[in-house]
Amino acid sequence: MAVPKRKTSPSKRGMRRSADALKASTYVEDKNSGELRRPHHIDLKTGMYRGRQVLTPKESA
């Protein structure tokens, strides 16, 4: 059975755990519609990505 050779110091333990925290999602304002969207993601309402039409826009029902 594998066991640690040395005790993990509180500093090392804290540095390892620092990546475990939840981070708030970032949003940017869309240039065309002015709505908030995730960066590097397609705007599903308009179907635009980086100034190009990549999807057909959704119809509002």
From Swiss-Prot:
Organism listed in the record: Rhizobium rhizogenes (strain K84 / ATCC BAA-868)
Alphabetical keyword list: Ribonucleoprotein, Ribosomal protein
Gene Ontology MF: a single term: structural constituent of ribosome
Family indicated by similarity: Belongs to the bacterial ribosomal protein bL32 family.
NCBIfam families hit by this protein: rpmF_bact
Residue stretches of biased makeup (Basic and acidic residues): 28-41
Region (Disordered) location: 1-41
Gene name of the record: rpmF
One of the GO biological process terms: translation
HAMAP family xrefs: Ribosomal_bL32
Name listed for the protein in its UniProt record: Large ribosomal subunit protein bL32
